[in-house]
């Protein structure tokens, strides 16, 4: 079967702008994008690459990522975008686990590749040789290798918040369904424009942005590295139709000196994903009359639920309903559906859900209940079938035998005007098993912040839900995908307690 859809897209939209690199001020049409991929496919074949070989790229948002993606689609090779925020040992572990054959890289990040087999370092994407290989002016058409829908197309490694990163597998079928589901849900067409600021090693940038926009014939604007001020300038210049980012990125754009709410109001969709919805984001943008929509997905099941613009005004914290061709249910610990309004684990069944983890059959089996992926997220559904995320199941704090949802504590804490941002975690306690601590970024210096916040929290929550520690931080620790690093924050709290013993 032929999954070389970029060739089909180029036949219909040959001269339409497909990709614009903002940093290089260079653009490519769909015809040129396909020509680059054809040329790269020929090159990979000349290097002995065969169907099933894993080809990696270690680079910021760059046209080379798309060259290799579509060349892999044409040759049957497996595409692996690597997270350049990881440290050398983490990268080496992924490279070994994935059984990588060749690695393309950006020279700027070469220092992070010291621990891998240096024979795998194939080519710097910024050298003249690379440009000569993919030059669309010298197009060599490539006959795509036949593949089956269930064949492995890509590996994307999780951020490893609960242990070592796992390789999430994507088949050709799951990739195409991912793009098509979102394309149909959002009614994307060739007039759509978006800026890709989220790194393309992340499903939010790759599966949820690149795939649906290019499948619909739209235009991608590449931001090489995210910067809030630069993004605001890019929005003013390119007038995107929609944008999708994680909460920390919205904070940065909002607080940049050049933030212009009118540029955001002009968009059809402004989507918050990649992390639990934050009320503070909605509230901050709402004061400018900007409506932020919540979406939901994870590496194993990219963007499978999303709210609508109208419904998000009535239910701003809902992640909405399942997108087209997705079945979402709330299950108890026995795998049975819970009644409406009750909390259970969100489970997803869809063609775009991963078939499992690379070389990890036991972990794959634990991740599924029948054909439903168990997301690890606690959720509930209301009478309108709108879904609300409550918290991560594994992040539930059990203190003195009582269950405490960190999100409930965070939401109450965020209501106080002193608190800019906060993350709540459990830490080890000799009497209660776990106790509650909050890492907070304060809006202003206040020597009595702990007493003030404690009084505020006790007026809103039961005593056992109130943090025993409030720890101010200047910057919230973030993991490699720029989400709050709760493992690091928990360790910070445990270290702080041990120093006082």
Tell where the protein language model's regions lie, with residue ranges.
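Conserved pre-ATP/AMP-binding loop-to-beta segment of ANL
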Residues: 14-15, 139-157, 164, 187-193
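Conserved AMP-binding A3 loop
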Residues: 27-31, 153-177
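Conserved AMP-binding/adenylate-forming
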Residues: 42-86
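AMP-binding/adenylate-forming catalytic core of the ANL superfamily
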Residues: 86, 103, 350, 355-356, ...
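ANL superfamily adenylate-forming
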Residues: 108-149
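Conserved AMP-binding/adenylation subdomain of ANL enzymes
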Residues: 176-193, 201-242, 252, 256
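Gly/Ser/Thr-rich phosphate-binding loop
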Residues: 240-245, 254-314, 327
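Conserved ATP/PPi-binding loop(s) of AMP-dependent carboxylate-activating enzymes
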Residues: 322-325, 336-367, 402-404
